[in-house]
Regions:
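N-terminal strand-loop element at the rim of the active site
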Residues: 11-20, 26-28, 32-70, 182
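Conserved acidic donor-binding segment of nucleotide-sugar-dependent glycosyltransferases
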Residues: 333-346, 353-360
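A short, active-site helix/loop in glycosyltransferases that binds the activated sugar's phosphate group
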Residues: 152-197
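Aromatic "clamp/platform" in nucleotide-sugar-dependent glycosyltransferases that forms part
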Residues: 301
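Short hydrophobic beta-strand element within catalytic cores of glycosyltransferases
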Residues: 318-322
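A conserved mid-protein helix/loop that constitutes part of the nucleotide-sugar donor-binding site
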Residues: 21-28, 220, 229-244, 261-264
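Nucleotide-activated donor-binding/catalytic signature segment of Leloir-type glycosyltransferases, i.e.
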Residues: 264-283
Length: 390
């Protein structure tokens, strides 16, 4: 057990236990570290609407512009007054990495930058990031122009990514990524001079694995859980697949659990495709849906290490995922665990689902979840936090 040390955990949005994604992962990490004797405080750019009684919460005074002098002064004073030993920046994939750096902040605290996404963030599938402009001729010409300019834009985006990663590694004390694969990606895009600063730690399991799971509780449900956005999640692909499957599998349904800026577009696509037995459930606790679903679907352009895959396995759902991010094979190593489909091959994705829907349901192998257990994640984090920035 480490002697009491103080940790500030930052994310742009307030860290809570009821949100998904990075917010939930950060909250679970905070609880883990408290159990190891650390004291935790939260800091966010945007003000919190509801206080939690578990951790002290602070928000930056200037929510409109992170890089204001007021925010820097506030952060430095907070670190000094609270005797902060470590700053954990959970938003290091964003531009906050330039703020929480020794180039910007005057602090003795050890800065640990945490990248909760893939390193490439879809740049290796650049054309898939370009949304179509529409079906009219002017819109099609606009889309064509975007495609023509894509190689140059990709080159510039990768150049910017390299510069950002180099800055991150230079001015952070330590950098945590989700997978050993992402350490390799970092070193491919940057020099190896700061390789010693890189650590691979996946997120904790968000649910306890049920000891027993009756197949009788499972229904003929395909499930999507997550944010409804275009560039990364591409749920429109799943709707295209469902369009082909629904006439064949009339006793199956598709549930979409989540919300986001692309929801309205998806609902319009659903109407255009005349989709049946599709339910947009909005933002809800996904646990009841995992319990009754047989298959969880991901058709993303890029992911980090999506918690939805581990959550699905914990509740006996078979994950069917595009092999579009470099940690995919680590999460789904074999067909006993789930199904990996070649990236963006909708025909193969449809065929894979069709086969599973025709087969008798069998609970997938969840042995892979052992690597996300608390004792393993704890050991990895204690190694990162052991010696500060020594």
């Amino acid at each position: 057990m480490i002697a009491m040390k103080n940790i500030l955990i930052y994310f742009d949005y307030p860290i809570t236990s009821i949100q998904g994604g990075t917010e939930q992962a950060s909250f679970l990490l905070a609880r883990l570290l408290v159990r190891q004797g650390f004291r935790i405080i939260f800091l966010s750019l945007h003000p919190f609407k509801e206080k939690n009684n578990e951790f002290p919460q602070y928000s930056l005074p200037d929510s409109e512009y992170l890089f204001s002098r007021r925010n820097a002064d506030f952060t430095e004073k907070l670190c000094d007054e609270q005797n902060i030993n470590f700053i954990l920046n959970e938003g290091a994939a964003s531009d906050s990495s330039f703020f929480f750096s020794h180039a910007h902040l005057n602090t003795k605290a050890t800065i640990v930058s945490i990248i909760n996404f893939s390193i490439w963030e879809g740049l290796d599938h650049f054309l898939s990031l370009i949304p179509p402009s529409g079906n009219t001729w002017p819109a099609k010409l606009k889309t064509a122009a975007r495609v023509v300019s894509a190689p140059w834009k990709k080159y510039m985006a990768i150049r910017k990514k390299k510069a950002k990663l180099n800055h991150l590694l230079e001015y952070s004390d330590k950098v945590v990524v989700l997978s050993q694969k992402y350490i390799q990606d970092c070193l491919f895009l940057t020099s190896t001079r700061n390789a010693h600063k890189l650590y691979a730690i996946p997120n904790l399991l968000t649910f306890q694995i049920p000891e027993s799971l009756s197949p009788g509780t499972k229904q003929n449900i395909l499930l999507y859980v997550g944010r409804l956005s275009y560039a990364d999640k591409r749920v429109d692909r799943l709707l295209s697949v469902w369009k082909k499957l629904q006439p064949v599998h009339t006793d199956w349904s598709l549930y979409i659990v989540g919300d986001g800026e692309y929801r309205e577009n998806l609902e319009k696509i659903s109407e255009e495709y005349h989709l049946k037995r599709i339910f947009f459930m909005g933002h809800q606790n996904p646990e009841p849906f995992y319990k009754k679903s047989k298959i969880v679907c991901l058709t993303s352009t890029h992911e980090g290490m999506p918690m939805v895959v581990n959550e699905a396995l914990a509740y006996g759902c078979i994950p069917v995922v595009f092999d579009s991010f470099h940690a995919a094979k680590e999460m789904i190593p074999d067909t006993e665990t789930g199904r990996l489909v070649p990236a963006f091959n909708l025909k193969q994705y449809t065929k894979t689902l069709d086969g599973l829907m025709k087969e008798r349901y069998r609970r997938p192998n969840f042995k892979v979840l052992d690597k996300y257990k608390e004792e393993i994640i704890t050991r990895k984090w204690l190694h990162v936090l052991k010696n500060g920035n020594e």
